Amino acid sequence: MAEVVDPVVIAIVAIYLIAVVVIGYYSRIRLKSAMDYYVAGRRIGSVVNGLALESTYLSPASMLGLPAYIFLIGYPFWWAMVAIICGMPIAALLTASALRKYAPVSFADYYADRFGDEKLRWWIGIIVIVGSILYITLSLVGMALFMVAILKMPYVIALVIGTIIVMFYVVYGGMIATTWNAAMQAIVMSFAAIIAAAAIVWQLGGFEGVYFAAEQSYAKIWNSPANAPDVPHLFSSSWIAILGWYFVWHYGFATMPYTVVRFFTVMDIKTARRSIFWCSLIGGAFYVSLELIGITAKYMIEKSHPIAVAAGGNMTATQVLGVIQKTYGIGTVTDYSMIAAVEALGNPVILGILCAGGLAIAMSTAAGWAVTVNTIIARDWMVKLLKWKRAEEKPVLYGRIIAFIFLLVSFFIAISPPALVLDLSGWAFVVVICSLAPGLILGLWWKRATRAAMWITAIVMFFLSMFAWMRAHLVLGHHARFFLNDVLFGNPNVLITPHQTWLIPLGFIVFIIVSLLTKPPEEERIQKYCVELTKEV
């Protein structure tokens, strides 16, 4: 990596950051009420909301994590990309239109009303807090890595700068700033990925060169489980593993708090549907670009990165990343592989655009989760449950304080992150989806869904998912290994279940069984929060 800070890169990123600050400032002027802070006054159109959905949902786990996993495993995550994009239209059918018709303010509102229990806000809030901390952490890690690429500074200093920037526009602008900034950030990040991918394809002489680079780096890259045991990696060695990778992120768009709340901000039901179209279209182009960067990253780093060139071309990509890690104190340096591949192009304009795009996606995701969690705590806990008059009189102030606290907590975790950004993302997804998705989806579409099922599923699946993931990660060495492999089979590698994805269908099974065994809800509640909301959606 070149040690000199390139003024072109800094100039491009500075323009982007100025735009963020301007949007944050003018959003604060437009901030007239708590409703503006929490749900942007429900005035957002389809294109803006679609762009905001993309940049919030497709986090640094996508921009850094997806290419990093291709770099690690040597297998292009086609199924993961397809799963995420295909999961977007599902949201239009399952949750988006129905929830916009209901028009809540907080993610917990529907659960409390549908199941007739305000105390559910406590437990839902705890689960959302866990997801928020994981996601804000991975977003701050992403920001710091791009700041390292921009300013060639130590990772921790870059992390401080990135956290302060996010604090400024989230704490002061709320959902209005978050939404408009997210829309602008979607354009920047998508354009950045497309430009970087196009430049790599051009430098390699076209798609034939891309194919050659991929095969040179990973001889088994095109093999599927049908070729087992001759597969790229243990974690893609079976069809169960492939299905696991597919479903980790598939249902998140319809059920994760930070995307669901975006359906609350739009003008009407039709706008909610159309916003998903725009998100799917632009997100698809973004992901194809990331795949191209990922499968060529190793080749580009070894052949053209300044560190490898300075060593006479005798360094592996892993060794190059090791030098970067030692120089800047980066915790999970594999996440830097995508940036290193673009650095290998030797084009400061493209690197500047990529870094601006990387900051955009990281800031958008961190902001989306920060606003989601401060709504849960400041509104649901303080006002709805604890009846604090001060919080009710000054909801925006308390929301800002909470956002600040969560960004600070995530900052300290990001100093030495516990896993790769894609791993943190998958962990958050599985924990939240297996615990809360059954109650949301079946609550809307199944009359028999009961309060007891909601409580039991949320509690049991939350603790089980936390334990299973951590045992697989800490005891067996990786989250992709089924957490009881050693106990049941005496071999940690027998069954590969990425992020313990079996927990998601299990959550639905538990919910259905408990619902059938417990007292059904009142007819009036079913009519209002199930039948009416799903009629003609």
Segments (PLM) and residue ranges:
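Membrane-embedded helix-loop-helix hairpins and adjacent transmembrane boundary segments
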Residues: M1-V537
